[in-house]
């Protein structure tokens, strides 16, 4: 993507430096994910699976990154590409090879974990109310008019509680209701 900017190159570099200094944990996570890419790309019979995180939710192994629900984030054909002036990791995608780096892995992991959390919440919500639609991180349910307050409270309670494997994760929810999705 290209963005028009009136900032000088020096100012842009300064802003990047400030971001990296203030958000050192983010940068460290990017580096851990770069290392995971390296390990997955060079996996051999002597390699040992290991957890990417302190909570033992994300297992780096030959197959990719194993998520808490047992599914994997997999980068088929992952390799270190040295064909251009700047080397990079690439993997086979639908339309050829796509480059990837630690920050991209973080984005993929965050999106996958968010989807797992919402999916688990939907299973719990389904015990009392019928989810009929999801939009990003929103769950749309149907409830009787005289049960809207109870339904809202139940759904907020469920969606504001992190799963056991993510204890301490700040999750929150707000609820709206109307006669149709467009009214919310």
Regions found by a protein language model. Give the residues of each.
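Conserved catalytic core of nucleotide polymerization and phosphodiester-bond processing enzymes
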Residues: 1-184
């Amino acid at each position: 993507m290209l963005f028009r900017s009136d900032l000088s190159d020096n100012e842009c570099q300064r802003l990047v430096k400030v971001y990296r200094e203030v958000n050192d944990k983010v940068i460290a996570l990017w580096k851990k994910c770069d290392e995971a890419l390296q390990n997955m790309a060079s996996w051999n019979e002597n390699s040992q699976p290991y957890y990417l995180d302190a909570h033992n939710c994300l297992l780096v192994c030959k197959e990719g990154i194993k998520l808490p629900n047992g599914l994997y984030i997999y980068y088929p054909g992952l390799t270190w590409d040295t064909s251009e002036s700047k080397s990079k990791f690439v993997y086979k995608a639908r339309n050829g090879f796509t480059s990837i780096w630690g920050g991209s892995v973080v984005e993929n992991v965050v999106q996958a974990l968010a989807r797992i959390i919402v999916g688990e919440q939907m299973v719990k919500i389904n015990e009392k109310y019928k989810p009929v639609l999801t939009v990003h991180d929103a769950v749309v349910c149907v409830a009787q008019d005289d049960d809207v307050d109870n339904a809202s409270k139940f759904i907020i309670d469920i969606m504001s509680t992190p799963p056991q494997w993510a204890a301490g994760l700040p999750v929150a929810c707000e609820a709206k209701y109307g006669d149709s999705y467009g009214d919310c």
